[in-house]
Curated annotation (Swiss-Prot):
Protein's gene: Zdhhc9
Keyword Transmembrane helix listed: yes
Subunit text: Interacts with GOLGA7.
Chain's role: Palmitoyltransferase that catalyzes the addition of palmitate onto various protein substrates, such as ADRB2, GSDMD, HRAS, NRAS and CGAS. The ZDHHC9-GOLGA7 complex is a palmitoyltransferase specific for HRAS and NRAS. May have a palmitoyltransferase activity toward the beta-2 adrenergic receptor/ADRB2 and therefore regulate G protein-coupled receptor signaling. Acts as a regulator of innate immunity by catalyzing palmitoylation of CGAS, thereby promoting CGAS homodimerization and cyclic GMP-AMP synthase activity.
Biological process terms in GO annotation: peptidyl-L-cysteine S-palmitoylation; positive regulation by host of viral process; positive regulation of cGAS/STING signaling pathway; positive regulation of pyroptotic inflammatory response
Ranges per topology, Lumenal: 57-63, 205-228
Protein name: Palmitoyltransferase ZDHHC9
Compositionally biased residues, Pro residues: 346-356
InterPro entries linked: Palmitoyltrfase_DHHC (IPR001594), PFA4/ZDH16/20/ERF2-like (IPR039859)
Protein's organism: Mus musculus (Mouse)
Active site residues per record: 169
Cellular compartments annotated: Endoplasmic reticulum membrane; Golgi apparatus membrane
EC number: 2.3.1.225
PANTHER family from the UniProt entry: PALMITOYLTRANSFERASE ZDHHC9, ZINC FINGER DHHC DOMAIN CONTAINING PROTEIN
Length: 364
């Protein structure tokens, strides 16, 4: 018995999503289009750690302790895992309104604001929302055709509205929002510890070697160590400073976007409605709270009307389950297969019987 299975091309939702994101692995990986600085981040981390494991760790494990490369490997793996999780995950993109939803929202806005006289500027599209006895304004996004949720903002680089938008980070090649902020914070924290660790033990390595062969001779024999020290020295200040800044924001339950705009620290001195007034509670909510699922449904299947593909024919959707012997299967050509699977044509109507012939002349 032979079975013919015809597979149809499936259109996933990530193939039709608007915005400026790129997708890999059938929609499982989501990043921004500008990935050059992200590759630079990978190169610096991988290159520095490779040199450290190849030269300094081997010497320090013998001279001091074998635990030195073990802790370095743990920090390196944790940093890479959090970096990739931050870069490849959905930061919290909010889907755009469908045409029917956008039309309904426009009708609501027109009914609320009324007719605007010609030549006058229409009023701002804002809704008031109450959080912890405080009024928060929900702004309308003209690109996504939605009223953005609280703390959401539209990223001009990725062209998407992101929930609890913090900032767009080119070093990780993605936006930082509600769904990947904790991984971003853990990445910069672990990277700070890794940078300090590698920098400190490079200094120890140079000091131990200098006691035996001298300082200048050590620098000549280990040019890779000099390169590592320079990279770590210039990286240390920015990474550690960034970690301290975000630790301050986490303690206040505040985002970078809110801090830049002065939403809760400006002249009005409006109290942050999202802060619990306790550092421990704020840290637990930001870093340990439940992770919301992605609302994009990137790997969902689009119906044929939306995917733009033609409907399958009868021959494409049907399968042949006719029992055949091996010999007949080998000698059957494509025309015979088509005849077997095609729909039989209607039989023509029977012809009327011919009238009886006239009697011969002899009978007459």
């Amino acid at each position: 018995m032979s079975v013919m299975v015809v597979r149809k091309k499936v259109t996933r939702k990530w193939e039709k999503l608007p915005g400026r994101n790129t997708f890999c692995c059938d929609g499982r990986v989501m990043m921004a289009r500008q990935k050059g600085i992200f590759y630079l981040t990978l190169f610096l981390i991988l290159g520095t750690c490779t040199l450290f494991f190849a030269f300094e760790c081997r010497y320090l494990a013998v001279q001091l302790s074998p635990a030195i490369p073990v802790f370095a490997a743990m920090l390196f793996l944790f940093s890479m895992a959090t970096l990739l999780r931050t870069s490849f995950s959905d930061p919290g993109v909010i889907p755009r309104a469908l045409p029917d939803e956008a039309a309904f929202i426009e009708m609501e806005i027109e009914a609320t604001n009324g007719a605007v006289p010609q030549g006058q500027r229409p009023p701002p599209r804002i809704k008031n929302f109450q959080i912890n006895n405080q009024i928060v304004k929900l702004k309308y996004c003209y690109t996504c055709k939605i009223f953005r949720p609280p703390r959401a903002s539209h990223c001009s680089i990725c062209d998407n509205c992101v929930e609890r938008f913090d900032h767009h980070c080119p070093w990780v090649g993605n936006c930082v929002g509600k769904r990947n902020y904790r991984y971003f914070y853990l990445f910069i924290l672990s990277l700070s510890l890794l940078t300090i660790y590698v920098f400190a033990f490079n200094i120890v390595y140079v000091a131990l070697k200098s006691l035996k062969i001298g300082f200048l001779e050590t620098l000549k024999e280990t040019p890779g160590t000099v390169l590592e020290v320079l990279i770590c020295f210039f990286t240390l200040w920015s990474v550690v400073g960034l970690t301290g800044f975000h630790t301050f924001l986490v303690a206040l339950n505040q985002t970078t976007n809110e801090d830049i705009k002065g939403s809760w620290t400006g002249k009005n001195r409006v109290q942050n409605p999202y802060s619990h007034g306790n550092i421990v509670k704020n840290c637990c909510e930001v870093l340990c709270g439940p992770l919301p699922p992605s609302v994009l449904d990137r790997r969902g299947i689009l119906p044929l009307e939306e995917s733009g593909s033609r409907p399958p024919s009868t021959q494409e959707t049907s399968s042949s389950l006719l029992p055949q012997s091996p010999a007949s299967t080998e000698h059957m050509n494509s025309n015979e297969m088509a005849e077997d699977t095609s729909i039989p044509e209607e039989m023509p109507p029977p012809e009327p019987p011919e009238p009886p012939q006239e009697a011969s002349e002899a009978e007459k």
